[in-house]
Amino acid sequence: MPVDISSLLHAGYSNPLLREWQGVRPITKSSLMYPIFISEIDDAKEAIDSMPNQFRWGVNRLEEFLGPLVKKGLRSVILFGVIESKKDYCGSMADSENGPVIKAVKEIRHLFPELVVACDVCLCEYTDHGHCGLLYEDGTINNAKSVERIAEVSGNYALAGAQIISPSDCMDGRVKAIKQKLVELELSHKVCVISYSAKFASGFFGPFRAAANGAPKFGDRSCYQLPCNARGLAKRAILRDVREGADGIMVKPGTPYLDILAMASKLADDLPIATYQVSGEFAIIHAAAAAGVFELKRHVMETMDGFMRAGANIVLTYFTPELLEWLEY
């Protein structure tokens, strides 16, 4: 039976090296950013029940925790503060000198000067109402005051030594305000902004909110995080942040939004594109692997391939410790 020569594909991926050549750039250790939770208790190592192998770490234990990972090739981390007390209307502990993030930035920069430190910037972990910004009396978001406060926190993180500011609050105009604050502080030449541009009001955030003690006390975040089916709004949010001077763009969550990730890589093709494999994605994969549904390593690596194929340069994932091991070989 005659065969159309152009239909013969198997030979092109008939051995492992050829299969590598057929793919896009694979995930590397440099592509990984590890999200870590910093406790207000300096000596803490508190297990997070909903997130296997993840802990809230006190600043005094960061050397014990991060040292082995840095030796394995960890290049960057992103910090999330966790507090139980001293929450207030404006989230004053977010950038307090005695707060977990400021202390952790200084300690990590001292212990591991080669490690790139990013700070998530949001107020939900620190406000008494659990929302990501400041509120009017009727409980709605005061965008202008929120942006002012987010820029203030960002500036203080930069002064403490953070090299990357990552606002996740979803306020309109915050990238421009942060960039202006960095110019004012004469830090705009060495502190970059990777914005959570396309952050969706996702159910996959559940385990994180428990881990960071940052769930809203009333209502939800659907008026400032993007609707899950809103491709057009995501496009506008990405383009807005590019215009406002973002140095990188992030899509969050990861796996359910690969189409948005691919779109971001085209809309902002001259910027680094990040995606966040969030706590719910992490928990689902762990639970399925524990139940014998699939093999953990193979499935995690497949999700990494999906992110890179869709256009990511940076992947935030709680699987970073395992990936540092797997990518060694």
Swiss-Prot record:
Coiled coil: none
InterPro entries registered for this protein in UniProt: ALAD, ALAD_AS, Aldolase_TIM
Record-level Gene Ontology MF annotations: porphobilinogen synthase activity; zinc ion binding
Binding site for Zn(2+): 122, 124, 132
Entry-linked PROSITE patterns: D_ALA_DEHYDRATASE
Binding site for 5-aminolevulinate 1: 209, 221
E.C. no: 4.2.1.24
Main EC class the enzyme belongs to: lyase
Annotated metabolic or biological route of this protein: Porphyrin-containing compound metabolism; protoporphyrin-IX biosynthesis; coproporphyrinogen-III from 5-aminolevulinate: step 1/4
CDD domains to which the protein is assigned, alphabetical: eu_ALAD_PBGS_cysteine_rich
Keywords: Heme biosynthesis, Lyase, Metal-binding, Porphyrin biosynthesis, Zinc
Any one of the GO BP annotations: heme biosynthetic process
Binding residues annotated for 5-aminolevulinate 2, in chain numbering: 279, 318
Description of how the protein assembles with itself and partners: Homooctamer.
Function: Catalyzes an early step in the biosynthesis of tetrapyrroles. Binds two molecules of 5-aminolevulinate per subunit, each at a distinct site, and catalyzes their condensation to form porphobilinogen.
PANTHER family according to UniProt: DELTA-AMINOLEVULINIC ACID DEHYDRATASE
Family per similarity comment: Belongs to the ALAD family.
Entry protein name: Delta-aminolevulinic acid dehydratase
Source organism of the structure: Schizosaccharomyces pombe (strain 972 / ATCC 24843) (Fission yeast)
Taxonomic placement: Eukaryota, Fungi, Dikarya, Ascomycota, Taphrinomycotina
Gene name of the encoded protein: hem2
